[in-house]
From Swiss-Prot:
It catalyses: [heparosan-N-sulfate](n) = [heparan-N-sulfate](n). Homodimer. Interacts with HS2ST1. This is D-glucuronyl C5-epimerase. It comes from Bos taurus (Bovine). Residues 29-617 are lumenal. Pathway: Glycan metabolism; heparan sulfate biosynthesis; Glycan metabolism; heparin biosynthesis. One of its GO terms (molecular function) is protein homodimerization activity.
Length: 617
């Protein structure tokens, strides 16, 4: 210092010391300010601190700040996440009093019955969403966007589809392109003999349910109109110069036979095979890893089978799906799944969804629901044929919607009874107060959706077998429930077509509207003369719908049926998926009927999905 003083005059030395002191004071104040407003990282994004609070925080004593920082970051790491966030700074004059708002736990007494824990922020009280969700029947979840959490709340869980206006009998059926009937857990499998779903909804034994079969057909019909054409890989046509097919790679073990032969009935060559059941069978390498809809033309001369080997996601294990010439529904043993496809002693086409067949087999159970499974096929490895018979046109494709549609249409033609209906061969108990429906009952919803399916099959093929079947299907509409029909009369005035023809009548809304859509499809397709009866039934039904629609409006949602009126019990409120079905149906009807009531109800019922309610007095 003496050396420095000797070399620098006192005025310069004083300036240097003053600058040094000023820098020290500024740095000291900055450190104090930073610590005073320090908050846990996971809470800092939620704090809103205004300029006055920041200023108060900067003036907090350093000892107190150090104590708080040390306590929050070191002493209680678990509590740090649970503690309510503190909003605002500290007031030095108030003995450490927190400025602004803070969360604090508060008891919440619910309806004078029980207490739950909530949180209070000033005058605002927050209840746990786990309680809110159940109490108000609402929905919410935490989702991530760009690394940040966000809570999304919704009043309902079901969506309304945009109506393709106007509706036509040869077009997409409502929003059925989004239906996947075969993957439902109440579908036991797709029958190998019939090619349609077998339901277990009301009985684990399985039964054919006309509504489900019609929906299966209508969904695939609609998908065919809305999806791009499928990719098809041809593996065998038995033609030597077929440029579209893959190179033939058949393996014929000793004792087996395979050859291309002419089939005069088909005017083409086919593959003849002879392979004893005890042999490995003749096999064709496939190796497809993209598509899983297999199709082949088949004719057996003896008992036999066609099997498909699949490499799966289950540790790359091989599973084999066997299509056997018997009537067994489905069986599963170890890694082998069996579907009976019937004798097949005349030429027929077998089309199977290997994904569905694999998963239904692995998930097979003795209960009403198929067991959930994650297994999926990764590769279609090879096809194996045993017995004596013929094969042709072996393909694998992305989809085969029209095959599924015509399987449903053909089933409806084959299984319609002499009264024009499709009897449902399972007992149905709708609820307390209603008599059980014994096996053999008809459903107006089944009749309507079957008609919609058959009309489309007729419009595609111009085959009158489909139109005639649809025309006969109007007969149950004319008979009362107690006469083994589907008609009910509300207040001795309004004709109604019952989804469930119960005693007393139930007046289910969605099933009634489906029955009307079927009648509309038929009257528009059959013409003035043939469609006369369908037109009369449709017009009477539409009059009833317009008169009775207000009975299904609760002011905040819709009602499934009128059991509260018929039985004098609590109303049967429609779940949100049924509520949106009501809206989708009314949207469709609004494109074929100009009555303003349909658009008015659509608008109001849509608003209920967002929490709107009718005005009170």
């Amino acid at each position: 210092m003496r050396c420095l003083a000797a070399r620098v005059n006192y005025k310069t030395l004083i300036i240097i010391c003053a600058l040094f002191t000023l820098v020290t004071v500024l740095l000291w104040n900055k450190c104090s300010s930073d610590k005073a407003i320090q908050v846990p990282r996971h809470l800092s994004s939620g704090f809103r601190v205004d300029a006055l609070e920041k200023k108060a925080a900067a003036s907090e004593s350093n000892n107190y700040v150090n104590h708080m920082a040390k306590q929050s970051e070191e002493a209680f790491p678990q509590e740090q996440q649970k503690a309510p966030p503190v909003v605002g700074g500290f007031n030095n004059n108030g003995g450490g009093r927190v400025l602004g708002l803070k969360y604090e736990e508060i008891d919440c007494l619910i309806n004078d019955e029980h207490t739950i824990k909530g949180r209070r922020e000033g005058n605002e009280v927050f209840l746990p969403f786990t309680w809110v969700e159940k109490y108000f029947d609402v929905y919410g979840k935490v989702v991530q966007y760009d690394g940040y959490d966000r809570f999304e709340f919704s009043h309902s869980y079901s969506k309304v589809y945009a109506q393709r206006a106007p509706y036509h009998p040869d077009g997409v059926f409502m929003s059925f392109e989004g239906y996947n009937v075969e993957v439902r857990d109440r579908v036991k499998c797709i029958s190998g003999v019939e090619g349609v779903p077998l339901s277990t909804q009301w009985g684990p034994q399985g039964y054919f349910y006309p509504i489900q079969i019609a929906q299966y057909g209508l969904s695939h019909y609609s998908k065919n109109l809305t999806e791009k054409p499928p990719h098809i890989e041809v593996y065998e046509t038995a033609e030597d110069r077929d440029k579209n097919s893959k190179p033939n790679d058949w393996t014929v073990p000793k004792g087996c036979f395979m050859a291309s032969v002419a089939d005069k009935s088909r005017f083409t060559n086919v593959k003849q095979f002879i392979a004893p059941e005890t042999s490995e069978g003749v096999s064709l390498q496939l190796g497809n890893t993209k598509d899983f809809i297999i199709s082949f033309d088949l004719k057996f001369l003896t008992n036999g089978s066609v099997s498909v080997v699949l490499e799966t996601t289950e540790k790359n294990q091989l599973f084999t799906v066997h299509y056997v010439s018997n009537t067994q529904l489905i069986a599963f043993k170890e890694r082998d799944i069996y579907y009976g496809i019937g004798p097949r002693t005349s030429w027929s086409t077998v089309t199977r969804d290997l994904v569905t067949d694999l998963r239904k087999g692995v998930g097979l159970s003795n209960t009403k629901a198929v067991k959930p499974t994650r297994i999926m096929p990764k590769k279609v490895v090879r096809l194996i044929a045993k017995g004596k018979g013929f094969l042709d046109n072996i393909t694998i494709s992305t989809t085969a919607h029209m095959a599924a549609f015509f399987a449903a249409s053909d089933w409806l033609v084959r299984n319609q009874d002499e009264k024009g209906g499709w009897p449902i061969m399972v007992t149905r108990k709708l609820g307390e107060g209603f008599k059980s429906l014994e096996p053999g009952w008809y459903s107006a919803m089944a009749q309507g959706q079957a008609i919609s399916t058959l009309v489309r099959a007729y419009l595609l093929t111009k085959d009158h077998i489909f139109l005639n079947s649809a025309l006969r299907a109007t007969a149950p509409y004319k008979f009362l429930s107690e006469q083994h029909g589907v008609k009910a009369v509300f207040m001795n005035k309004h004709d109604w077509y019952e989804e469930y023809p119960t005693t007393p009548s139930s007046f289910v809304l969605n099933g009634f509207m489906y029955s009307l859509i079927g009648l509309y499809d038929l009257k528009e397709t059959a013409g003035e003369k043939l469609g006369k009866e369908a037109r009369s039934l449709y017009e009477r039904g539409m009059e009833s719908l317009k008169a009775m629609l207000p009975l299904y409006d609760t002011g905040s949602g819709t009602i499934y049926d009128l059991r509260h009126f018929m039985l004098g019990i609590a109303p049967n409120l429609a779940r949100w998926d049924y509520h949106t079905t009501h809206i989708n149906q009314l949207q469709l009807l609004s494109t074929i009927d100009e009555s303003p009531i349909f658009k008015e109800f659509v608008k109001r019922w849509k608003s209920y999905l967002k929490g709107s309610r009718a005005k009170h007095n």
